[in-house]
Amino acid sequence: MSESTRHGVVSDGGKFADKAVFRSFVKPADFHQALLDIGAVPGNNMNKDNAETTLTEGSNLKLTFTWKDQESGKDINDVIKDSNGNPIQIRFSGNLDNANEKKTGCITCLDSCLVGITSNASYPYGSVEKAKTVEFNGNMENFPLDGEPVVITYEVVE
């Protein structure tokens, strides 16, 4: 995972699955509902008019990654590197209508997003691909082998 991407986790059936750091078997609508079920509150504050100047809102989420020989789990900031050294701050962005319409499959975006169910409140939309103010890459010191099954746990934190 040496090539920079803004696509952290994408549903296997989504249009952007081939661009993701991790592919998931969950559908965006099911994932959205699961977050509601654990008490997360969606931000739903981004749209095409404000995306490049707005940071996503919604419940703060902790992501923990576990895989074979790493059962204790690793935080997203240990698994994915931000080129600026800023913490990745995943929020429950919401965006269910946009996700259903666009069919990208985006579960977790690495900058704020108006389509992804969750996204990073550290950067506005376009920071990776358009403005190029940040790059995200896998931290190979804390990264599963290619093709290794990974469990990603999302937890609401205050």
Language model region names:
Residues 1-158:
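Long, low-hydrophobicity ectodomains and other hydrophilic envelope-associated domains
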